[in-house]
Structures are given as structure tokens and as C-alpha cells.
Amino acid sequence: AAVPASASGVLLVDRAAIAENYRILKAAFLEKAVAAVVKADGYGLGAEQIVPSLVRAGARSFFVAQLDEALKLRPLLDRCHPAIALYVLNGLTPGTETLFADNTILPVLNSLGEIEAWSRFAQQRGTAQPAAIHLDSGMCRLGLPPDAVERLRGNPGALDGIVPTCILSHLACAEEPDNPKNAEQLAYLKQALTALPRAPVSFCNSSGIFLGRDYHFDLGRPGVALYGVNPTPAAPNPMRPVVRLLARILQIRAIDAPQTV
Ligand SMILES: *Cc1c(COP(=O)(O)O)cnc(C)c1O
């Protein structure tokens, strides 16, 4: 590959390497189901260019951050495969219920308020509505905090009309295998899951997959490792490189003191 004359640089994205990274992660996840996180336009590499390769490699669940990203990807995913689950991590913003349901996009419910809104919507429509439920096990960013989980335990009717297709939680320090936070989050998650109906559990981001089978549960949820970033920073990178930056050398100059640059 060369830099075209009209450009001073080119970023090359190797889609075959992304597909190979999906297979490497799936093998590390002991061949259980692995979703693909393609938020932020596929970590800046172009979600629409990447998604078909991931579907061909076997991905059947996708995660984005925002509903707008999901609305853009839904028709493409439908053309790739008839049964792709598409989740929005940022959750159910007020008034978006119809957009989610009519486009077969699944909200990740992050609070009791979102659970209440989705349950009410299901009852209004008269049909059960699928969704993921996000438990915060220590990341302290999004998801139900422990007190909300305990309120759900005491009031399972709050989930009426909701079909949980996935219960997810996010590791805060998985790239540090010796960090005690990992085991703390795992122990809390196991305890919190007893407050919820049974559903496939998704706990592992890229680095989490390499913490071993105790952390795996049912569905892997890697992002950055698909794109070649090392999920095990203390060890050699098991991923294939995906991105190559070529830049044109504009000029080479020979200079010497007292010249300055
Ligand atoms: C970004 C994100 C992921 C993917 O994490 P990586 O570290 O990029 O593998 C998984 N789950 C959630 C909730 C995220 O926000």
C-alpha cells in the first residue's frame, strides 16, 4: 500500500485481522458465545466497514454506546444475518422506548427508573419486551448499584413484562490480573445474580476473558482487543495487529548548529 499523492497519510484497517482476533478471543473464551463491542464507530475504525467481517466470524450480539449508533447499524446487521442482537450500553433515555422496540434494538437497563419505564412500555404494548440488565459490581459508572439490586430482590414484580436476555456487569481493572478488585467484583456479582431471574450473564471485556474461566459466565463482551490492543499488558500481545499508519515523508533536511529547529 502507498500513500496517495493527495494525502499526507493513510490509516489502514485490516478487517481480516479483526475477524482473526474475534476467533482468538473466542478460543480464549473456551468457544462460548462472544459478542462484539463496536461503540464509538468501532473504536474509531469504522463500524459499518467492520461489522460484516465480525458477523462472518460468528458474532451474533453487538454492543454500541448510543441509540443513534444502533439505528445506523441495524439495517446493515439485518442484511448480514437474520438474528443479530443489538444492545445500547447507555440505556433507555426517556421517550426512546418506541424507537428501541420498532427497530429491534435492546436497551441495557442501567437503573430502577429505566426498568420501570421499560416494564410500563411492555404493559402498554401488551407484549413482553427483551432487554439486558446492567449490575454495577464496582466500576461505579453505569448499572444498578447494590441498593437497587436489593430493592429488586424484594420486588421482583418490578420486572413484569421484561424478558432479560442478558445480565451484564463490567470489570474495572481486568487488565491487572493481580488486582484484588477483580475477585471482589466476581464475588459480588455471584451474590447479586441471586436477586434476578436467570439469564445469560456477560461479565468479561477484552481483558476479562484472560482472567480465566471463573470469570467467563456465558457471553464475552470484548471491544479493544478485537482492534489489536493488548488485553494482557504484562505479557506479549496475543492479538493480531489491525491498524497501520502510513505517512508521507515531506522533506529530509541536513542541518547543523547554529541552525535551530
Ligand atoms: C467498552 C465496553 C466494553 C468493551 O471493553 P474493552 O475493554 O474495550 O474490551 C464492554 N462492556 C462495556 C459495558 C463497555 O462500556
Question: Where are the regions that the model predicts?
Answer:
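Active-site-proximal beta-alpha core segment in soluble small-molecule metabolic enzymes
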Residues: 5, 9-13, 17-19, 29-191, ...
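Short, basic/glycine-rich phosphate-binding loops at helix/coil junctions
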Residues: 1-2
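Anionic-ligand-binding alpha/beta catalytic cores of soluble enzymes and soluble regulatory domains
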Residues: 178-261
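Alpha-helical scaffold segments that flank or form the walls of functional sites
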Residues: 21-23
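N-terminal nucleotide-binding beta1-loop-alpha1 segment
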Residues: 26
